[in-house]
Each structure stands twice: as C-alpha cells, then as structure tokens.
Amino acid sequence: MALAVTHVLGAIFILDILRHYVFGKDKFPRYLLVIGGIAGLAPDIDFPLGWFISFVQGTSVNFHGEFTHSVLIAAIILFMGVVRHYQDDDKWAKIFYVIAAGWFIHIGFDCLFNSYETFLWPLEIQTKAFCPQKLAGFYRSGIDAI
C-alpha cells in the first residue's frame, strides 16, 4: 500500500505538471494544488472512520478499500464539477474537478501498489487483474522512499 505522503505528494506532483504544461498557471491557481493534495488522501478517510466505529462498538472494524476507494465516488464528484461548469460557476467547477482528479490519482496509486481488490464498488467485480503485480511487489518501498 502506498503511504499517505505518497498519495498527497503524488497528487500534487501530477496536478502541478498538468498546471504547468496543459492548463496554464493563470487558469490553475496554486490553492487548487493544495485541494488536490488533500483530495489525494481523502479516500483513506475510512481508516479514522473504522477506528471510531471500532471504539464505539468495542469490536474491530476494517472496511479500508471498500466504498471510499470506488471510482463511482470520483465519477460523482466529477459530475458535480460538470454541473457547476454548466451553471457558470467556474471556481467551484475547478474545485470539484481537482477533487475528482485527486481521488482518481489515489485509486491509481493503490492499484499500482496492489493494496486492495475492488475499485468498482458497489459491483462485486474483483479488479486485481487490472493492477500490475510485478510493479506492486518490486518497486513498492522504493517509490514511497522517493
């Protein structure tokens, strides 16, 4: 599994490349990079939620990689950006687009590091076959160290 810092910095790095070479600095302010970095970590909100539920119920609960790591949530956030775009609210459209990008980047990193098996929740389709096995095992600690 990729570490939290990899999710945050990786999302910021990828979004900054897009900012410089695709969209332009004037159309992509820096605060969006911060939002994208936070969104790159957002799918892991299931860790503290699981800890809280475990504390309240007195049992061990672990639902990491289930609903928060779904492409469906990222697609819903992307759709919210499209709706805001057509309502001529460009500021919020960009924010939703960047959150969706950070969410997709998180799922991509988790696929590369082979940390879970389903990213098409609520469908019960095992998606481990889509993720590269060799990269996940061989380069895992090296990429986190960089």
Question: Could you tell me what each predicted segment is?
Answer:
Residues M1-I146:
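N-terminal membrane-targeting hydrophobic helices
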